């Protein structure tokens, strides 16, 4: 007699109720999929002999791409089934619970009906996904390495002794011991055999010579370069807004900014197009990877966008994206590590292997976070393609911190340096480090009508404080100078707060809270004064205030702030001394728009306030911070900067050609001789060079500025010879060539001349009282210090 458990009847009944016709149909699809999987793959797996490596898969395996596609589709279908059944199960459970009025429940040790079936389907989906990955790798290997070698020849694979490949045997030894340390090696077909090591090291990497029996079949032909397309200026930015993506407050801010400035970018493009005339511009394929916005870097900026956090980086990135797009180049934008890996062609694994394909981008714009991510995941390809990278670097990277060996030996410690890039690959927010390239950003440009309206609507006694975060207002001693300012002006703040007024803000300050950008601009257009507390350093807000007709008042730092005495700069790859909150505003704009005073000197501060109230200024914006100025600058960089070309060696005197200079008529400096041909390929053009001998203890950056010029590090190789010293009437009793970021230089006493041995260490920055540095300077376009007169 057969007995039936009542609980079993109930379970069967519930399953029959739960598995309605649609669900039975879905399960049928799943069963059919599994059957198709086994039948379709059976032949392919049978083609592989037991014990063979991926290199010995028979070439009769056909339909590799199709099989991969089928596997992917089946995996996706099963995942979709799981999601649909999960949703239906939740709906069924909720409806049953609703009908039962809360009486129906499951014991703690029993799963709901159908849960076991769901788990099985999920496990099947995971297995199919895993099989898809494995088969995908196997089929890739079979197609990539389809030239099968006989077993006898395979046993004869040995590391060749070739003087052109001195590291080959060592790399083979390393592969024997470590090939399982990263799955990427198996992805490229390494299976532990000697032949697989040699094939990988000769065809994927380049440490071993090509194997003779694979030359004709396995060697990949270099892809044909795509036909050149001419870049065309764009004025419609709707596609750019789509490229920028969404989902982060930072991206929303950037898109709003781009949209607001659309008309100004369009007008700037029209003006630059007229200026360039028929100049041919090749369209570049450009990847923009904003590393600091990735989850892997922490993305500390996005959550603070709506809370008064710093916006300078997002302002700059929005303008970089827009400028590149308006110039007509092909853009790809990534803000996640997964997107970066996909666009670069990173193989699966831990980043030890090169990319799976040639880099499809002519240029990559990123930041230090993105640079770290690329180095971690590109393997040897990072070294191969790093010349195409441009690093957006707010505070600059000096050559002494960039050269890893030199920085390590001489104590130039930093959290961000040691990259061994050409220093011009680092691109700054302001032109404070001529060793780097000045990228910048834009401020809104007013037309003449708007300027007149602003000038007529100014309140003569209204001041706005620079600082949206309450922490900025914790400055010690602020009550003293704010008290003086309060005697003459009504003080306004835009400090973020959630529920109650920040206690750091004095009661006499009228705090508007965090304002949207249009409202903040309206506040600036009414104000007479924009006053800084000393932080943040070198942001875009002071330029924006000056452009809206404000006078900017800032504190003078004594002693100057640097990585030696100030926590903010500690660890940054620069020794630059900052003498005020905004050195660019002080040095390149100055009075009457910018006043720099000692806030600790009450008399000086009060006198400045009185003078400012009597001073009338017009809205002012330097050309290099207009949309046209930024377009002009980036166009010149893309056209002329080529860091993939091998640099000219810094030859010692015995091998250096005679310098093509003549002493200027006033005998103070060297100039390029008129009857001398220009250096081919030099940019900036060599005729812009002016060479000065600095006084002891003076950096080349300051020496050139003293003469109304800009230091130009690309001219250093022309001066790196004893002949340059002789032309300046400096006798050299001895000449030595060494690695030192201060060379070429003349040492006193001793009459010794020192030449530079390492091209990456040519540096405008740096000084020592022992040396008189030989400094290459150049002229610059009015309002555009990044470009010389003949650079465009």
Curated annotation (Swiss-Prot):
Residues 46-792 are lumenal. It catalyses: N(4)-{beta-D-GlcNAc-(1->2)-[beta-D-GlcNAc-(1->4)]-alpha-D-Man-(1->3)-[beta-D-GlcNAc-(1->2)-alpha-D-Man-(1->6)]-beta-D-Man-(1->4)-beta-D-GlcNAc-(1->4)-beta-D-GlcNAc}-L-asparaginyl-[protein] + UDP-N-acetyl-alpha-D-glucosamine = N(4)-{beta-D-GlcNAc-(1->2)-[beta-D-GlcNAc-(1->4)]-alpha-D-Man-(1->3)-[beta-D-GlcNAc-(1->2)-[beta-D-GlcNAc-(1->6)]-alpha-D-Man-(1->6)]-beta-D-Man-(1->4)-beta-D-GlcNAc-(1->4)-beta-D-GlcNAc}-L-asparaginyl-[protein] + UDP + H(+); 3-O-[N-acetyl-beta-D-glucosaminyl-(1->2)-alpha-D-mannosyl]-L-seryl-[protein] + UDP-N-acetyl-alpha-D-glucosamine = O(3)-{N-acetyl-beta-D-glucosaminyl-(1->2)-[N-acetyl-beta-D-glucosaminyl-(1->6)]-alpha-D-mannosyl}-L-seryl-[protein] + UDP + H(+); 3-O-[N-acetyl-beta-D-glucosaminyl-(1->2)-alpha-D-mannosyl]-L-threonyl-[protein] + UDP-N-acetyl-alpha-D-glucosamine = O(3)-{N-acetyl-beta-D-glucosaminyl-(1->2)-[N-acetyl-beta-D-glucosaminyl-(1->6)]-alpha-D-mannosyl}-L-threonyl-[protein] + UDP + H(+). One of its GO terms (cellular component) is Golgi membrane. Keywords: Disulfide bond, Glycoprotein, Glycosyltransferase, Golgi apparatus, Manganese, Membrane, Metal-binding, Signal-anchor, Transferase, Transmembrane, Transmembrane helix. It is found in: Golgi apparatus membrane. Its main location: Golgi. One of its GO terms (molecular function) is manganese ion binding. Residues 1-24 are cytoplasmic. It is a single-pass type II membrane protein. InterPro entries: GT18_cat, MGAT5_Glycosyltransferase. The chain crosses the membrane at residues 25-45. Its EC number is 2.4.1.-, 2.4.1.155. Glycosyltransferase that acts on alpha-linked mannose of N-glycans and O-mannosyl glycans. Catalyzes the transfer of N-acetylglucosamine (GlcNAc) to the beta 1-6 linkage of the mannose residue of GlcNAc-beta1,2-Man-alpha on both the alpha1,3- and alpha1,6-linked mannose arms in the core structure of N-glycan. Also acts on the GlcNAc-beta1,2-Man-alpha1-Ser/Thr moiety, forming a 2,6-branched structure in brain O-mannosyl glycan. Plays an active role in modulating integrin and laminin-dependent adhesion and migration of neuronal cells via its activity in the O-mannosyl glycan pathway. Belongs to the glycosyltransferase 18 family. This is Alpha-1,6-mannosylglycoprotein 6-beta-N-acetylglucosaminyltransferase B. It comes from Homo sapiens. The gene is MGAT5B.
């Amino acid at each position: 007699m057969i007995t039936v458990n009542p609980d079993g009847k109930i379970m069967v009944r519930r399953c029959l109720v739960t598995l309605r016709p649609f669900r039975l149909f879905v399960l049928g699809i799943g069963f059919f999929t599994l059957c198709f999987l086994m039948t379709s793959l059976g032949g392919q797996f049978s083609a592989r002999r037991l014990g063979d490596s991926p290199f010995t898969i028979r070439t009769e395996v056909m339909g590799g791409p199709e099989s991969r596609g089928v596997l992917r589709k089946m995996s996706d279908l099963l995942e979709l089934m799981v999601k649909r059944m999960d949703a239906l199960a939740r709906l069924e459970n909720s409806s049953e619970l609703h009908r039962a009025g809360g009486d129906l429940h499951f014991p703690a040790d029993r799963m709901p009906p159908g849960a076991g079936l769901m788990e099985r389907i999920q496990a099947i989906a995971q297995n199919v996904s895993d099989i898809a990955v494995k088969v995908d790798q196997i089929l890739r290997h079979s197609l990539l390495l389809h030239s099968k070698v006989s077993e006898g020849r395979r046993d004869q694979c040995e590391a060749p002794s070739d003087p052109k490949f001195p590291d080959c045997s060592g790399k083979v030894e390393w592969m024997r011991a470590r090939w399982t340390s990263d799955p990427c090696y198996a992805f490229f077909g390494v299976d532990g055999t000697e032949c697989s090591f040699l094939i990988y090291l000769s065809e994927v990497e380049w440490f071993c010579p090509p194997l003779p029996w694979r030359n004709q079949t396995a060697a990949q032909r270099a892809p044909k370069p795509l036909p050149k397309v001419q870049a065309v200026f764009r004025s419609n930015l709707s596609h750019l807004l789509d490229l920028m993506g969404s989902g982060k407050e930072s991206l929303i801010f950037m898109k709003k900014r781009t949209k607001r400035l659309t008309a100004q970018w369009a007008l700037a493009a029209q003006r630059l197009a007229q200026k360039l005339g028929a100049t041919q511009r090749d369209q570049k394929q450009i990847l923009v990877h904003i590393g600091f916005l990735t989850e892997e870097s922490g993305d500390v900026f996005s959550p603070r966008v709506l809370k008064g956090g710093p916006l300078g980086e997002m302002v700059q990135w929005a303008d970089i994206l827009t400028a590149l797009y308006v110039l007509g180049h092909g853009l790809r934008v990534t803000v996640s590590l997964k997107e970066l890996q996909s666009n670069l062609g990173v193989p699966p694994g831990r980043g030890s292997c090169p990319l799976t394909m040639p880099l499809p981008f002519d240029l990559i714009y990123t930041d230090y976070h993105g640079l770290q991510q690329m180095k971690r995941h590109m393997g040897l390809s990072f070294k191969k393609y790093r010349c195409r990278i441009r690093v957006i670097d707010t505070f600059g990277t000096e050559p002494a911190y960039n050269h890893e060996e030199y920085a390590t030996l001489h104590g130039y410690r930093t959290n961000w340096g040691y990259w061994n890039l050409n220093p011009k690959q680092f691109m700054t927010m302001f032109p404070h480090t001529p060793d780097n390239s000045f990228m910048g950003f834009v401020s809104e440009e007013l037309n003449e009508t708007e300027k007149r309206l602003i000038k007529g609507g100014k309140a003569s006694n209204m001041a706005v404080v620079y600082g949206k975060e309450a922490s900025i207002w914790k400055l010690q001693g602020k009550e003293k100078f704010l008290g003086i300012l309060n005697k003459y002006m009504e003080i306004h703040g835009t400090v973020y707060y959630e529920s109650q007024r920040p206690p750091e803000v004095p009661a006499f300050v009228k705090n508007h809270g965090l304002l949207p950008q249009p409202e903040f601009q309206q506040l600036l257009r009414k104000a007479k004064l924009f006053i800084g507390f000393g932080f943040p350093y070198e942001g875009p807000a002071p330029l924006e205030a000056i452009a809206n007709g404000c006078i900017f008042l800032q504190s003078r730092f004594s002693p100057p702030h640097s990585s030696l005495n100030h926590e903010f700069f500690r660890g940054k790859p620069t020794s630059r001394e900052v003498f005020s909150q905004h050195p660019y505003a002080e040095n390149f704009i100055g009075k009457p728009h910018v006043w720099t005073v000692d806030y600790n000197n009450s008399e000086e501060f009060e006198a400045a306030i009185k003078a400012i109230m009597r001073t009338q200024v017009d809205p002012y914006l330097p050309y290099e911070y207009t949309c046209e100025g930024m377009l002009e600058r980036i166009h010149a960089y893309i056209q002329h900067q080529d860091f993939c070309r091998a640099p000219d060696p810094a030859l010692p005197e015995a091998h250096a050609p005679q310098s093509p200079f003549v002493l200027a008529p006033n005998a103070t400096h060297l100039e390029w001789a008129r009857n001398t041909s220009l250096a081919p390929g030099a940019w900036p053009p060599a005729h812009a060079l002016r060479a000065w001998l600095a006084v002891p203890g003076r950096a080349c950056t300051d020496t050139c500025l003293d003469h109304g010029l800009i230091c130009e590090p690309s001219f250093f190789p022309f001066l790196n010879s004893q002949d340059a010293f002789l032309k300046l009437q400096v006798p050299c009793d001895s000449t030595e060539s060494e690695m030192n970021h201060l060379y070429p230089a003349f040492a006193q006493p001793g009459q010794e001349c020192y030449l530079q041995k390492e091209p990456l260490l040519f540096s405008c920055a740096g000084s020592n009282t022992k040396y008189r540095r030989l400094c290459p300077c150049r002229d610059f376009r009015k309002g555009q210090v990044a470009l010389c007169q003949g650079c465009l």
